Structure formats: C-alpha cells, structure tokens
C-alpha cells in the first residue's frame, strides 16, 4: 500500500502565477501540485493535493489526513498561517509530521507575516524558495519518516 502525504494550500494560492508575480513568481498551483506529485513519487509516496480559501475546510482536511493515516503533511496556510489558532490546534491534535511552506520570504515582508501559528505546530518551516520549497519540504519530510528515494 502506498503511503500518502497531504499537500494543503490555503487562501489565494489558487491565484499563483497571476497574483503579484514579483513576490510569488509565475508558477501556477498546477505547477506546484505536479512538482509535489513527482517528488513524492520518488519516495514511493502519493501526494494528495488540495487548495481552499476556507479555514474550516483546511481543518477538515487535516482531520481527513489523520483518518486516512497520512504519513505527513505539507501546508502553506497563506494568510491563515499568521492568524489561525484552529489550524495550529488541528495539526497538534493529529500529530502528523508537518512542514510549513511559504513561496515568498515572509520575513522580508510585512511585520504581521513574521508570526506563524502553523510554524509552532510543524517540525520545519521553509520560506523564500519559490515553489522549490515544496520539493524541499517533501525531501525533509521523507527523511523525517525514514524514506529514501527510489532509483
């Protein structure tokens, strides 16, 4: 049975490629999802990708990941990273190894973006690598759960 990881993208990430390309680049959400699926497959993992603009749906997807015994979670909470205690609590509650990802370097941006509730629940945070951060997150997650790349 193939292990799964959930890749969750929060509000406005459906606009990747068109929203503020000077900050977020020209890659689309479809590019992110393809990158995640390809990278996960190198480790014998299946990446289950979701994007939603609704906080409660993110919480529900985190619960679903636990119910389906996902091996890990990659999350870009978008703006909810800085505001959502509910998402933090969901991650803590399910105890799935989690990596937080941000396309931009949140620490080079507005001060309110320097605080992340998700980071406090994740074992790692990556920011500023563009969509490459998702690949790096999967590499780190695979190492954390003891998987090596398949040749």
From Swiss-Prot:
Catalytic residue list: 24 (proton acceptor), 102 (proton donor)
Keyword Amino-acid biosynthesis: yes
Keywords: Amino-acid biosynthesis, Aromatic amino acid biosynthesis, Lyase
Gene Ontology biological process terms from the UniProt entry: amino acid biosynthetic process; aromatic amino acid family biosynthetic process; chorismate biosynthetic process; quinate catabolic process
Pathway: Metabolic intermediate biosynthesis; chorismate biosynthesis; chorismate from D-erythrose 4-phosphate and phosphoenolpyruvate: step 3/7
Single annotated GO MF: 3-dehydroquinate dehydratase activity
Reaction(s) this enzyme catalyzes, per UniProt: 3-dehydroquinate = 3-dehydroshikimate + H2O
SUPFAM superfamilies registered for this protein in UniProt: Type II 3-dehydroquinate dehydratase
UniProt site (Transition state stabilizer): 19
UniProt: substrate binding residues: 76, 82, 89, 103-104, 113
UniProt EC number: 4.2.1.10
Gene3D superfamilies assigned to the protein according to its UniProt record, in alphabetical order: Dehydroquinase, class II
InterPro entries: DHquinase_II, DHquinase_II_CS, DHquinase_II_sf
Role this protein plays: Catalyzes a trans-dehydration via an enolate intermediate.
Recorded family membership: Belongs to the type-II 3-dehydroquinase family.
Subunit comment: Homododecamer.
Name this protein carries in UniProt: 3-dehydroquinate dehydratase
Lineage: Bacteria, Pseudomonadati, Pseudomonadota, Alphaproteobacteria, Hyphomicrobiales
């Amino acid at each position: 049975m193939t292990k799964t990881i959930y890749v969750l993208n929060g509000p406005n990430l459906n606009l990747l490629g068109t929203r503020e390309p000077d900050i977020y680049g020209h890659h689309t959400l479809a590019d992110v999802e393809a990158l995640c699926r390809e990278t996960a497959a190198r480790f014998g993992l299946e990446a289950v990708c979701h994007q939603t603009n609704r906080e409660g749906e993110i919480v529900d997807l985190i619960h679903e990941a636990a119910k389906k015994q996902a091996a890990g979670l990659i999350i870009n909470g978008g703006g909810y990273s800085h505001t959502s205690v509910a998402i933090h609590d969901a991650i803590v509650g399910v105890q799935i190894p989690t990596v937080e990802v941000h396309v931009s370097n949140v620490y080079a941006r507005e001060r309110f973006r320097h605080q992340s509730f998700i980071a406090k629940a994740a074992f790692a945070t990556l920011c500023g690598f563009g969509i490459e951060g998702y690949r790096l997150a999967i590499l780190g997650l695979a190492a954390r759960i003891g998987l090596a790349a398949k040749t």
